[in-house]
Amino acid sequence: MGERFSGKNVVVIGGNSGIGLSAARAFAQEGAGVVITGRSPQTLESAAQQIGHGCVAIRSDVGVVSQIGELFARLTTELGHIDVLFVNAGIGAFQPIEKVTEEDWDTIHGINLKGVFFSVQKALPLLSKGSAIVLTGSIGALKGIPTGSVYAASKAGLRALGRCFAAELVGKGIRVNVVSPGPTETPIIGRTAGLPPQAIPAIREQMIRNTPMHRMGTPEEVAAAVLFLCSREASAITGSPLRADGGVVMSIT
């Protein structure tokens, strides 16, 4: 494997499982110094061991702005600068309209939108010309999904953030892109609020039926898209929503 990121500092917000873990592992294998964050100390420790290569794990809740500030204050001291920021933290929750509470709305948007915004804001002093930012979106921002209104709204907002960030930061030489996964084999499927465990297999089969490739994507496939967007090969790409969705929304622009 090549070393496209040799000597680079990479921070993965939400790097303790799924797509974030796969991306962090791939960055480390390509020579980067990697920092991952997450909320669970146990999961973080396990992830850091899997990643290896001196990966640093820091407990930080992206849903709490003060913790985001503390994280980047620490990274300012310990790293000095960041070459790649991958903001992957997010939650999925699906409820019928009539059952959504204000707390549901605030929790989902607090992580998927507010947390993403302030992660980028707090990271900016550590980013400079040539840096890359990737945000994890979702095809839910483009495709109407029953019971998915709150989640989809948060991801549509994130997609807009990505475009605005790209427009605002292009003059500083910082690229910003969004990777939008389709149905992917990650732990978030099993943790999705509102779905009992016995319903997961049927939901998974429905996802496969609705995917033109007739299979779920893998975290490694999405991670490969993330690494491409952060690499020199993508140096002319900014403000783009790259879909890694198995063709689910190929007819939607």
What is each residue range found by the language model?
Residues 138:
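Residue(s) in the substrate-gating loop at a strand-loop-helix junction
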Residues 96-97, 101-107, 207:
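Substrate-binding pocket helix/loop in short-chain dehydrogenase/reductase
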Residues 143, 227, 238-253:
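Short C-terminal tail/terminal secondary-structure segment
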Residues 120, 154, 162:
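Active-site helix of classical SDR
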Residues 125-126, 167-171, 235:
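Alpha-helical segment proximal to the catalytic Tyr-Lys
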Residues 16-18:
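Conserved glycine-rich cofactor-binding loop
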Residues 97-98, 130, 143-149, 171-172, ...:
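Active-site loop immediately N-terminal to the catalytic Tyr-X3-Lys motif
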